[in-house]
């Protein structure tokens, strides 16, 4: 029983982020381990905005993975910033 509680607590801290990228702003969503929406926030598409976005996601728990649209275009800088922080980045198809 104790192991189940410990695993549940660890799981509750695992956060997944998703980012819809645009030229001027990126819209981020934070999801719990079951896909429940924890929050949505808009950030400027500049290095200071990337840092704020990652800090915001981290406020929900340990960020394990971030799915980003357009890692080769509008999301390229953000993808590099998040990868440099040691967080796995996954390309999300725009369709």
Where are these regions (language model features)?
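Phosphate- and other anionic-substrate recognition elements at nucleic-acid/protein interfaces
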Residues: 1-95
